[in-house]
Amino acid sequence: MRVLEVNESKGEVKVRVEDEEDVWILHSALRPGDLVRARTARSVAGSSGKEKIPMTLTIKVTGSEFQAFSNVLRVKGVVVEGPDKFGLIGSHHAIKVYPGKEITIIRERGLAQLLERLKKGEERKPQVPVLAVDYDEYSLAVVRGQGIEWVFEGSLRLPGKGDEGREAATERKINELAKRVSEELKLRNLDHVVVVGPGFLKDKVAQRLSEEGFKVKVDSASSGGRAGVLEAIRKGSLRGVAKELESIKALEALEEFVKHVARGDGYALYGVDDCMTAAQANAVKTLIISDDLLHSPDLGERAVELVELAEKKGAEVIIVPKGTEAWERLRPFGDVVCLLRFPISL
């Protein structure tokens, strides 16, 4: 993300989107009621029927559509400014945002919080590939700011332990898996990988990848597959490789939340109302909230107020994208939970 211009007196910030992580950051930063100005194409009636005309429009945001790990965001809203001759004021329009696109966001209140969120996009965005492998299954994932992207998974399908061809088959399967991982990493311009699993199989795969020139970190996990990847994140295998990935922080915070709920010690709350009460009491240490709650037609406005208040009070706010592992864990608790500095009475 490149912040191109800031006009604090008008509440305006102009940015250029540089990659798909920026698309996600914009989705999480935009609020209903924001104004978004950009070049776009609009179908208008002409002498020979409807045709798409490029133009600059400003819309008042009503919502946005984003699919995790995609590179296109559709910002939906009502046109408030545009060429007079087309009579578009008051009509609905969606502006597509993608890498390379420049847009201007206008926010009357809370520009500082918006800028803070957007400037996260100017920081380096690490991507950490994790391979979890055992004798039954394997899974390659890429852990990014917006969540865990599951790249591929499968089973090694090795012969039984008493089969005389097991050793040769194991070597062949290891080479095939290492080659597939190598191709995927090169495709994504990644030069590092974390390999986890039980026993010696992970070490053999790691050795092959190291011979391919990758920087490899090896750690133990009780299983391969998705469970092994998630275990690696929980136990901190990615620390030192990616310190500030928001997706990792979300999963770690949710683990802590569940522990406090199980203990009943009063250091964890969930739901918009209880989290709001805690924020008003300056008790919130960490707020974890789903982005679809922020864009909800029913609770979105109150959810935005909660985020703004928590940030104002100095709490860490983690926004979780729809469809990710953290989002699945957040859903049963009303899409928002918080960790407290101290217990409060409700």
Curated annotation (Swiss-Prot):
Which keywords fit this entry according to its UniProt record?
Cytoplasm, Endonuclease, Hydrolase, Metal-binding, Nuclease
GO BP terms in the entry:
nonfunctional rRNA decay; nuclear-transcribed mRNA catabolic process, no-go decay; nuclear-transcribed mRNA catabolic process, non-stop decay; ribosome disassembly; RNA surveillance
Localisation: Cytoplasm
Gene Ontology molecular function terms on file: endonuclease activity; metal ion binding
Task: Identify the EC number(s).
Answer: 3.1.-.-
The source's domain of life comes to Archaea
Pfam families per record: eRF1_1, eRF1_3
The coenzyme or cofactor needed here is: a divalent metal cation
One Gene Ontology cellular component annotation?
cytoplasm
**Primary site of residence:** cytoplasm
Q: What does this protein do?
A: May function in recognizing stalled ribosomes, interact with stem-loop structures in stalled mRNA molecules, and effect endonucleolytic cleavage of the mRNA. May play a role in the release non-functional ribosomes and degradation of damaged mRNAs. Has endoribonuclease activity.
Its quaternary organisation is: Monomer.
Tell me the HAMAP family matching this sequence.
PelO
| Family statement | Belongs to the eukaryotic release factor 1 family. Pelota subfamily.
The entry's free-text remark on domains says: The N-terminal domain has the RNA-binding Sm fold. It harbors the endoribonuclease activity.
Question: Could you identify this protein by its name?
Answer: Protein pelota homolog
